[in-house]
Amino acid sequence: MEAADASRSNGSSPEARDARSPSGPSGSLENGTKADGKDAKTTNGHGGEAAEGKSLGSALKPGEGRSALFAGNEWRRPIIQFVESGDDKNSNYFSMDSMEGKRSPYAGLQLGAAKKPPVTFAEKGELRKSIFSESRKPTVSIMEPGETRRNSYPRADTGLFSRSKSGSEEVLCDSCIGNKQKAVKSCLVCQASFCELHLKPHLEGAAFRDHQLLEPIRDFEARKCPVHGKTMELFCQTDQTCICYLCMFQEHKNHSTVTVEEAKAEKETELSLQKEQLQLKIIEIEDEAEKWQKEKDRIKSFTTNEKAILEQNFRDLVRDLEKQKEEVRAALEQREQDAVDQVKVIMDALDERAKVLHEDKQTREQLHSISDSVLFLQEFGALMSNYSLPPPLPTYHVLLEGEGLGQSLGNFKDDLLNVCMRHVEKMCKADLSRNFIERNHMENGGDHRYVNNYTNSFGGEWSAPDTMKRYSMYLTPKGGVRTSYQPSSPGRFTKETTQKNFNNLYGTKGNYTSRVWEYSSSIQNSDNDLPVVQGSSSFSLKGYPSLMRSQSPKAQPQTWKSGKQTMLSHYRPFYVNKGNGIGSNEAP
């Protein structure tokens, strides 16, 4: 048991201690060291350690050997991890002869390399799952050009966390001989992992009371300094990297250093703050997505109603066109019937005349058949006494006004299409081609939405110069008609011109009751007393109190909060109710 304890205090298990210790010239271990095959034990720790000290001292550079092997007045043996598990080929260790050997994958943490995020290690309890190791769905960036990410920070290396997590499931006990059991804890002092059976001395023995136990660690080399091979127990706040106690007196001398526990607590506080900020952003995005989902439904409902109105109006238009078509058709049929009746009358008259002529012809044929000359002459004289030449046939010309109907309908169709296209284009330019979704620029100075409410209503620009055209639209008396008036004269703001313009704009003509307009002394005085307004005019706002924007303090803006924000709501940006009388809180 004492031998086992001594081996644990030396940082390795009995099985892990092999013939890698430096030997003398004869190839055998000094001071009573026995060698049996490949494995050997040091019977005299002092002699063996002295020999190893010589070999290590020869490999170190001048000036480093003493600082590396001595701390104060006590000589310390460098802790070297020998892996006896199946991963021996992949183990990383330093050669006692050349100090080169296999390099640690964490060699980038040494001084002189580029600064990287600090390597963190698992503490007591379960290994923390990295928040960056989970798979993320691709997201659409909504960050505007020119903006900077407030929560931008270097991403941690997920490989270390994934290796630690996957390795903890396969770490084997370093003290088991033969069939190795699964390790349940790892000791940072012993630099070894133990199963439940071999962990009892650490739990029950007083000599191991100060040993720090953690969840099974697969690679102890990751906790060692790549320069000195010592356990990294300090954190350099200047270079933001883990160091050993030798680095504190050499490469990181005069740097601000703390223990890894203190640095971990500080980083955990920073991480908690970042998580809080991310949670607030998540809540904000969820609320914004919920709002836009409602806007999406509202847009669909609005479009459905507009489509119904479109269908109804065009259905009415088509019905009216069909009605007009039927009326034109009925007119054409009526005109046809009238013309046919007139032709029938003419044809009846012609038939009657033809009948009379046929009768005259038969009479003459009978007269021609008389053989008696006296009788023939008597009958012929009686016939010719009443005979007259038949009148000529009347001439008729049918005026078909419908011969130009095709051209008229073509012109009508072109005119109708032009009117439809003009109105449709007007509607499209007014509504369909407008950008319905605009970003709020309140953070850039000024509530542009508040300005747009007036510009959309009055057709003016808030940034227009201080001219009468800008302010006359707000001077409309109650019951009057709003009129925008702007004189063309450059000197329109002199005393006489201003009064004349206002008399023309708000005169006493019509049904409007006369009103005496009172002007301030700043306008009634001489021109030199007129205050100069920054801009393109010398218009005085003091003369018209109704033009002055209210300087009273604004009411406290209402806030729009979600039920998800019972905590940390003071970080939530509020939506401002602009006081437009509707009472709804609009989102940016």
From Swiss-Prot:
What does the UniProt record tell us about how this protein is modified after translation? Constitutively phosphorylated by PKC on serine/threonine in A431 cells.
UniProt keywords, alphabetically: Coiled coil, Cytoplasm, Immunity, Innate immunity, Lysosome, Metal-binding, Phosphoprotein, Zinc, Zinc-finger
One Pfam family in the UniProt entry: zf-B_box
Modified positions (Phosphotyrosine) in chain numbering: 106
Q: Where does Zn(2+) bind?
A: 225, 228, 247, 252
What are the residue ranges of zinc fingers typed B box-type? 220-260
Indicate whether Nucleotide-binding appears among the record's keywords: no
UniProt-listed InterPro entries: E3_ubiq-ligase_TRIM/RNF, Znf_B-box
Q: Can you tell me which residues the record assigns to a coiled coil?
A: 259-352
Give the chief site where it resides.
cytoplasm
Instruction: Give the sites modified to Phosphothreonine.
Output: 476
Provide one Gene Ontology cellular component: lysosome
Q: Where in the cell is it found?
A: Cytoplasm; Lysosome
Give residues where Phosphoserine occurs: 21, 28, 58, 104, 489
Cystine bridges = none
- What is the tissue localization of expression for this protein? Expressed in placenta, prostate and thymus.
What is the protein's known function? Plays a crucial role in the regulation of macrophage activation in response to viral or bacterial infections within the respiratory tract. Mechanistically, TRIM29 interacts with IKBKG/NEMO in the lysosome where it induces its 'Lys-48' ubiquitination and subsequent degradation. In turn, the expression of type I interferons and the production of pro-inflammatory cytokines are inhibited. Additionally, induces the 'Lys-48' ubiquitination of STING1 in a similar way, leading to its degradation.
Q: What is this protein called?
A: Tripartite motif-containing protein 29
**Which taxonomic lineage does the organism of this UniProt entry have?**
Eukaryota, Metazoa, Chordata, Craniata, Vertebrata
